[in-house]
């Protein structure tokens, strides 16, 4: 079974070509993020604005030793300073296991705070 995470990321139009190059160079990345209609997860284009990319992966084994995960993480690490054009959010099974990077669409892609509803 293994430890699972929920991952979402978005890339603004200025960096999309660079991410598409990562996809083109790695079949494993393409397989990981291909869109699955049934589960409403994977890659989507033009979700927030024309030319952007959004990826949602629910209940995934997001291990940094996996080649496809490493390639995606490298892309975000390389563009960390261009943080207005990227957004990466990951939450693990443990609620304190979270990663957040970038500000693109930060008002729509975020981890809600746990709270009591009544």
Predicted regions and their residues:
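Charged interaction segments
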Residues: 22-118
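Short, extreme N-terminal segment that most often corresponds to the first beta-strand
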Residues: 1-27
